[in-house]
Amino acid sequence: MMMFGKISRQLFSLKKIPWSCDSRYFWEWLNTVFNKVDYERIKDVGPDRAASEWLLRCGAKVRYCGHQKWLQDYNKLPGGSVDRYKIQAIDATDSCIMDIGFDHLVGLEHVERITLCRCHYIEDNCLQRLSQLENLRKSLLELEIIACGNVTDNGVIALRHFKNLKYLFLSDLPGIKDKEYLAEVFTKALPSLELKLNLK
């Protein structure tokens, strides 16, 4: 609730809101506000709580270590100790997450699975940024990228840096032009990876 209050204040403090622009520009601008990283908040509540708030605010779901249920309702975020709930899985299907929010993931140490499905703001630079996160490089085991139209071969190739990755599913990615080359890159970089391609 406190986070939404802060966002509301940011919205109302702006001198000029782009109402005159088309709605697509407005929504992109609003999604940028939702993705903005509040480093003080991360310090106050810890990386897992702050990342949970960001992901749920953007329409994604999280699952915590030791829990079977996914959490999607921002108002049902658990309270208590900052060390109690650790994100184990992220499902960003139909969410508005974008690269400027990825600093929320820096302190996460237990994320084993990520699904990026129909994420309109996921581009090559997002995947490159993901592959630079040291903690994620160690913990991530499964990754699915589905129907993210702005992803190309360049972004996917960066995923070879996830040395512990066991499963990678790529589907409905029209920006990928050379799936044979991708398969070759991953076979060489990650020989134990189960790579599933559903690409044209």
From Swiss-Prot:
Keyword Repeat on entry: yes
GO biological process: ATP biosynthetic process; proton transmembrane transport
GO CC terms of this entry: cytoplasm; mitochondrial inner membrane; proton-transporting ATP synthase complex
Repeat region (LRR), residues: 62-87, 88-116, 117-141, 142-173
Keyword Mitochondrion applies: yes
Entry keyword set: ATP synthesis, CF(0), Hydrogen ion transport, Ion transport, Leucine-rich repeat, Magnesium, Membrane, Metal-binding, Mitochondrion, Mitochondrion inner membrane, Repeat, Transit peptide, Transport
Oligomer status and interactors: Homotetramer. Associates with ATP synthase.
Record's function text: Involved in regulation of mitochondrial membrane ATP synthase. Necessary for H(+) conduction of ATP synthase. Facilitates energy-driven catalysis of ATP synthesis by blocking a proton leak through an alternative proton exit pathway.
Family designation: Belongs to the ATP synthase subunit s family.
Name of the protein in question: ATP synthase subunit s, mitochondrial
Phylogenetic placement of the source organism: Eukaryota, Metazoa, Chordata, Craniata, Vertebrata
